[in-house]
Regions:
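N-terminal leader/targeting segments and the immediate start of mature chains
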Residues: 1-43, 121-126, 154
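Gly/Pro-enriched, hydrophobic low-complexity segments
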Residues: 106-156
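An acidic-aromatic
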Residues: 50-103
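Polar alpha-helical coiled-coil and adjacent low-complexity
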Residues: 5-7, 22, 82-83, 89-101, ...
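Hydrophobic lipid-interacting interfaces of membrane-associated proteins
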Residues: 28-34, 60-62, 80-82, 140
Length: 156
């Protein structure tokens, strides 16, 4: 007997991806550029599911930069030294002084997890990913600047 139709073999449905927990990280930070040189601490909270992002950059006991927001309500960057307080619907539309530019929270996570980004090189890696990152680029006025990051803490 010849079957009239063939039933495809059962295929397992792809498992629904579990929601990723927010990433919390802390980095030693170094900067060299037209605004001078400095060192400090960069604290990062990224929730890729909502686009929530909080970046705090401290140097010598003062906050140099605060960036916060999410995809739904937009992002805000504050740089007290430069009297900068700016909002934008997307992360890529904001200036990020003292840091490599990223277009989205996902791009920031990719940079921190893999070291991939324009002008970024990884100088040291471990099982979790990049430990030391170096970025070389230009500021908005075309002056060269560099940033060094060294991972101190990573939580997922």
């Amino acid at each position: 007997m010849i079957p009239l139709f063939q039933v495809p073999a059962a295929q397992a449905a792809p498992a629904p991806s579990a929601p990723q927990a927010p990433v919390r990280a802390q980095y030693g930070w170094g900067y060299e550029g037209p605004d001078g040189e400095g060192t400090g601490t960069l604290s990062v909270l990224v929730d890729a599911a909502t686009g929530r992002l909080v970046l705090e950059l401290h140097g010598l006991g003062e906050r140099l930069l605060l960036l916060e927001g999410d995809r739904a309500s937009g992002y805000r960057v504050q740089v007290p030294r430069q009297k900068l307080d700016q909002r934008a619907a997307s992360l890529g539309a904001l200036p990020l002084p003292f840091l490599p530019g990223v277009a989205s929270p996902e791009a920031l996570l990719k940079l921190l997890r893999t070291g991939e980004g324009a002008g970024v090189t990884v100088t040291k890696r471990d099982a979790q990913g990049p430990v030391k990152l170096h970025w070389r680029g230009m500021d908005p006025q075309g002056h060269p600047e560099q940033v060094w990051l060294e991972r101190k803490r990573w939580e997922e």
